[in-house]
């Protein structure tokens, strides 16, 4: 110890040894660093139906009629040009098992905690349900985009299947600008393919993951005023992308997903999809349907309930009962990497 060093009494030590702040009080405040909210994009763009006292819902699939010349002396009996009312089908959407998210908070822990976290914990239960619905819709859209089975038999009704566009082998190693330009071109190809199948394109939307959204913003064409009639279609400054070939662009963290394994309570095998290579989903509201038997509902035990008395804890449960399925596969398309 140097001659001029002061011998300090360290008030935070225990018996003069160890950590110098061991006996100091730990202070906290009521601010909670909660999980960031994640927007659910897909849920906003599907056809929804609320049902009661049922397990499924049927959507009728009908086709086109044809015109032909009348043969003199031949009666019109309903089959001119091969027309047949029997060329129809049905799309059935079944309600899956009851989905829930729950949390039990021990009363003593809540009393000791300096922050009221119960409300935040219970809010996350509803968010968990919303996320699961959004991810399931994305998987069903991907299934529809990859469909190759025609729903009807007559040749005049062909083309009612999905569309998949595969990017080039060099896409993943290319620059941001190059990837943005290639993706924009692929979105245009999808729109043309849908037009050829008579799909109305006015209601199409495109959802991409955050990386691809940034690539479109970095590209040389999407936000370039020379390609947009002198009008703004997003800027580097704002980081926003407006439209590509007239299709509004959205971003979602639920687009790229690992392979999903079906559960016992999944009624639709189309949930089992692998979206690891998916880089865009283009679709309209007609592509997917969602049934709601029980809307999202939150329940919490009361202070004098049997659960609270027995476990000295508060239980919060969020539940919903839904079913999601393909409707018009021709209204769904995906863009994937090789």
Where are these regions (language model features)?
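Assembly/oligomerization interface modules of large self-assembling protein complexes
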Residues: 31-99
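Short, flexible loop/turn elements at secondary-structure junctions
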Residues: 63, 208-212, 320
